[in-house]
From Swiss-Prot:
This is NADH dehydrogenase [ubiquinone] 1 alpha subcomplex subunit 5. The modification N6-succinyllysine is found at residue 98. It is found in: Mitochondrion inner membrane. One of its GO terms (biological process) is respiratory electron transport chain. GO terms for cellular component: mitochondrial inner membrane; respiratory chain complex I. Pfam families: ETC_C1_NDUFA5. The keyword Ion transport does not apply. Accessory subunit of the mitochondrial membrane respiratory chain NADH dehydrogenase (Complex I), that is believed not to be involved in catalysis. Complex I functions in the transfer of electrons from NADH to the respiratory chain. The immediate electron acceptor for the enzyme is believed to be ubiquinone. It is a peripheral membrane protein. Its main location: mitochondrion. Belongs to the complex I NDUFA5 subunit family.
Amino acid sequence: MPYPVGQTTGLVGLAVCNTPHERLRILYTKILDVLEEIPKNAAYRKYTEQITNEKLAMVKAEPDVKKLEDQLQGGQLEEVILQAEHELNLARKMKEWKLWEPLVEEPPADQWKWPI
């Protein structure tokens, strides 16, 4: 359900999205596509995939903008879209960084000891 023309989010620098459901479906699908390239046993994939699938199901099930905002609990849908864009960028970086692989070298023995 598109917002009425001329309505504002009330947040500086955050424009109204006229098709928030479509935009969120696209973003969540892209996130899931990137996650499929990460090993299934990686913690990041496991938990991000679960959360993203839950959010995608909410977007598909709830056509009302206000009700969806309440269900997602992330503010206005434009804010949720921004969060999803950030998550997509992070997923791509996690894939690039390959954090699931073992360390190249062992960390120093007292690396986390404080005070030194």
